[in-house]
Amino acid sequence: MKKATPFILMIPCAILAVLILFACSKPQHKDDPAVQNTPTAEIQTPVLIEGKKEPLELLYNTINNPGTQTQNGFYRTVDTGESFSNIVYIDFSSQRMVYLCAQPNCSHRTPDCTSYLDSELSLGGFAACADSLYFFSPNGEIWRMNLDGSEREKIYTGAAAANLNTNLAYDGDNLFWIQTIPSGEKTTSRLVCLNLSGYNLQELCSFDETVSIAAVQDRSIVLQHRFADETMSVGKFDVDTQQETCIYTDETASAKYGLVDLTRYVYIDYTDKSVKEIIFGEQNPITLLENLDMNENTPIYVNELRDDHFAFTIHRPNGDNSYMIHDYYSIDLTTGNMVNQLPVIDNMGEETSAEIVADMQDAYLVRCGIQRVTYHTVMDDGTIQQREGPFAQYGMISKENYWKGISEYTAIQSDVNL
């Protein structure tokens, strides 16, 4: 074997350090061995994170239920079918859904109502932190309000296309989240930080691939990267140093579909029709379930990875019916036991799984029904126009019953009129 040339031996240590610090890089292309791993993150000088620097807390924010929870309840918006929407609140103790408004005899249809959102603010995302509610509008604005909806103020105006992308992180003084910014065929992901005292928003890092927040640990955010060539990696991003350490890389992610948490990646493996779990830092995955009734074209929806359980749904053709047959699976990751039924709901005639929207100590708030309702729209001439659309119903279910597939809910009563 030839000895390394003196030039190679004299590579500066600083360059090696940069490569290590940004090790969560895009795998090299198999058809071009000369292409080396390069950081996908845009390297920049670390910015100062202000505040007490407390351990991070993960704030869930799902695509189907873009809301937020506090210790006492859950917030989200509802579409009215008109040029505005309303903020509603589900109170855990009274088990009722109400408008976020305390005014007596309020119609909830005018801007003086604390639940009212005009068309430019409709259907955004929320984050509840301490004694405030933060609303992320689709037009790029961020609004702060009290938990009862009062004292609303606009604290930031950004690019209209910079949409909130699922989970957030919170450290007592700052909010962290991923913004996705489409530009033609390319989408850029930005990890940003908003200081909740001065409302200063800073970009910590930007990526050329799709990035999501999967978990938090101390002062680090676990990021899941998915690249255009369908490879993926997982890294821990220190919010203070703005350095990311790669903890897992998968060059065959195109044949897998799964979820990441703090310690593991649980996924459906299309190559051998199995469910596998890989613990970060270990070499070989653990097979949890074999011989799934599926093929390479079978659509699969991953439901949950939380409380040591992994849940997913297999969709199957249903003859000439437009609705598909759903098979639900839940795996206890501590015992390996599996049940083939999650709690189910009626989605306007089609069965679907009950989605978790809020997590209490011993129970979940779930979307336990989707009904077709009639929306009433008041036109400019005073006439009322009707249209039909979906409306979610909610219920509480014990965690034990949820993971056993027992559909025993306590229904949330609704004071919201459409």
What name fits each language-model region?
Residues 55-71, 109-128, 161-172, 206-218, ...:
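Repeated scaffold domains used in trafficking and secretory/extracellular systems
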Residues 74-78, 135-136, 176-179, 222-225, ...:
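Residue position within the beta-strands of beta-propeller blades
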Residues 26, 37-59, 83-112, 141-157, ...:
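Surface-exposed loop/turn elements that mediate protein-protein interactions on large endomembrane-trafficking
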Residues 1-8, 15:
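Positively charged n-region of N-terminal signal peptides that target proteins for export
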Residues 123-197:
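A generic tandem-repeat structural signature
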Residues 69, 79, 92, 128, ...:
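Generic beta-strand structural signal
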Residues 20-23:
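C-terminal motif of bacterial Sec signal peptides marking the signal peptidase cleavage site
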